[in-house]
C-alpha cells in the first residue's frame, strides 16, 4: 500500500537532495532514460556506430575471451531500500528542541525524507563512480541487483592512459628549474580534441604546484565571466578551482564515496586528467522494473522513488529509490589520464 504518491516523492527528491559530483556535472550533461530494459546506443542522437565491449568477470578476473561487442546493453539495477522504524518515531531527533518536542507524525516524515536522501546519495555515488572510471580508463565494472559483474569497455586507446616512470617522473625533476608545461602539451596531443581543463587529486596537485615554473605561470586571479571558469568555480567542499594555466583550467577534486562503510577517494593518489568541458558524456538509464511504476505510466525515468506499507503482523513501512544507470563516453579518447610519479 503506497503512502506518499510518486509525484510527491519525485518533487521532494528533486528539490531537496541535489548531489553535485564533479565528473557528472561537467563531463556528463546529457541524459537519456529508456523505456526498455536495455539501453540502445543506436537510438541516441548523434552517435555513429558506438559499441561497448562487454566481458564477464569471474572470480574477480575479466574474461575478455568470453566477451563481445554490442550496441545494446542492460544496465545493472540498483534499488537502495530502508525500513521506516517505528521505534525511531518515539525518540527525539538530533536537532529537535527539547523544549518543543515534535510529534511522531512529524518525526515519521523526517525519517522518510532522510531515508530518501540516503538512497539518492547511494545511487548518485554509483553514477559518479561510473563517470570517473569512464574518464580515467575508458571502462568500468558494472554491478547491480541480481546482476553478475561485467566489464563495460568503451574502447580507450592505450596511448591515452599514461604512466610516468623513471626519468620522466615529476618527483625526480628539479623543482627550481624544470617546467612541466612541455610534458602536459605532449600528453594533450593524445586527446581527440582540445584540452581546456586538468583535474588533479590533492597529491597530484601538490606535486604539480611544487615546480617554481607552475607558480609563475598559474593565473589565480578571479572575476572572469568565461563559461569555462563559471563551470568549475564554487562546486562545493570536494572541488577547488586553482586558476588558469595558460588557457587550461586547473581543478583539484577530493570527492569521496562510501564502500562497505569505508570512505574512498574517487581519484587515486597522483592522478592527472586532461579533458574538455564540452566532451559528450552520456547518462543513460534502463527502464524502471516495478509493477507500480508501470501502472503509473512511469517506465523511462532516471529514478523511481516509492514509500509503502507492507501488511502483515506486524505491519512494516519502507522507502526505496530504483534506478538502472549506465554512464557512457561516446569518445573515450577525448580524455587523457596520467598516473604521476
From Swiss-Prot:
One GO cellular component, as annotated? viral capsid
Alphabetical list of InterPro entries matching this protein: Major_capsid_GpE
Q: Where in the cell is it found?
A: Virion; Host cytoplasm
Native organism is Enterobacteria phage phi80
Extract the coiled-coil ranges from the record.
109-129
**Major place of residence:** virion
Q: Does the keyword Ribonucleoprotein apply?
A: no
Q: Does the keyword Heme apply?
A: no
Q: What is known about its subunit structure?
A: Homomultimer.
User: What is the name listed in the Swiss-Prot or TrEMBL entry for this protein?
Assistant: Major capsid protein
Pfam families recorded: Phage_cap_E
Q: What the protein does? A: Assembles to form an icosahedral capsid with a T=7 symmetry. The icosahedral capsid is about 60 nm in diameter and composed of 415 major capsid proteins. The assembly is primed by the interaction between capsid assembly protease and portal dodecamer, and major capsid proteins assemble cooperatively to form the procapsid with the help of capsid scaffolding protein. Major capsid protein forms hexons and pentons of the icosahedron. Viral genomic DNA is packaged into the procapsid through the portal vertex. The packaging triggers a dramatic reconfiguration of the capsid shell.
Q: Which family does it belong to?
A: Belongs to the lambda phage major capsid protein family.
Question: What domain of life is recorded for the organism?
Answer: Viruses
The UniProt keywords, alphabetically, are: Capsid protein, Coiled coil, Host cytoplasm, Late protein, Virion
Amino acid at each position: 500500500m503506497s503512502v506518499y504518491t510518486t509525484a510527491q516523492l519525485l518533487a521532494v527528491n528533486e528539490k531537496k537532495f541535489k548531489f553535485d559530483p564533479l565528473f557528472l556535472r561537467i563531463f556528463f550533461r546529457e541524459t537519456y532514460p529508456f523505456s526498455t530494459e536495455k539501453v540502445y546506443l543506436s537510438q541516441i542522437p548523434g552517435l555513429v556506430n558506438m559499441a561497448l565491449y562487454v566481458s564477464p568477470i569471474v572470480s574477480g578476473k575479466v574474461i575478455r575471451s568470453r566477451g563481445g561487442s554490442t550496441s545494446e546493453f542492460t544496465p545493472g539495477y540498483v534499488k537502495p531500500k530502508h525500513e521506516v522504524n517505528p521505534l525511531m518515531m518515539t525518540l527525539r531527533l538530533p536537532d529537535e528542541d527539547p523544549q518543543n518536542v515534535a510529534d511522531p507524525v512529524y518525526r515519521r516524515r523526517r525519517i522518510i525524507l532522510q531515508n530518501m536522501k540516503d538512497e539518492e546519495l547511494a545511487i548518485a555515488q554509483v553514477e559518479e563512480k561510473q563517470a570517473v572510471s569512464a574518464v580515467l580508463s575508458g571502462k568500468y565494472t558494472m554491478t547491480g541487483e541480481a546482476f553478475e559483474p561485467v566489464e563495460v569497455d568503451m574502447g580507450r586507446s592505450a596511448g591515452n592512459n599514461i604512466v610516468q616512470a623513471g626519468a620522466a617522473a615529476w618527483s625526480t625533476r628539479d623543482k627550481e628549474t624544470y617546467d612541466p608545461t612541455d610534458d602536459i602539451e605532449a600528453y594533450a596531443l593524445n586527446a581527440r580534441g582540445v584540452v581546456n581543463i586538468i583535474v588533479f587529486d590533492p597529491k597530484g596537485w601538490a606535486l604539480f604546484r611544487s615546480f617554481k615554473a607552475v607558480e609563475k605561470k598559474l593565473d589565480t586571479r578571479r572575476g572572469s565571466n568565461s563559461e569555462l571558469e563559471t563551470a568549475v568555480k564554487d562546486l562545493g567542499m570536494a572541488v577547488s578551482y586553482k586558476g588558469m594555466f595558460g588557457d587550461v583550467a586547473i581543478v583539484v577534486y577530493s570527492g569521496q564515496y562510501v564502500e562497505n562503510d569505508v570512505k574512498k577517494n574517487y581519484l587515486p593518489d597522483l592522478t592527472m586528467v586532461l579533458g574538455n568541458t564540452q566532451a559528450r558524456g552520456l547518462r543513460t538509464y534502463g527502464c524502471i522494473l516495478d509493477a507500480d511504476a508501470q501502472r503509473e505510466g512511469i517506465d523511462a525515468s532516471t529514478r523511481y522513488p516509492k514509500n509503502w506499507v507492507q501488511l502483515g503482523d506486524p505491519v512494516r513501512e519502507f522507502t526505496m529509490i530504483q534506478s538502472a544507470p549506465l554512464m557512457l563516453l561516446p569518445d573515450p579518447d577525448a580524455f587523457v589520464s596520467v598516473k604521476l610519479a
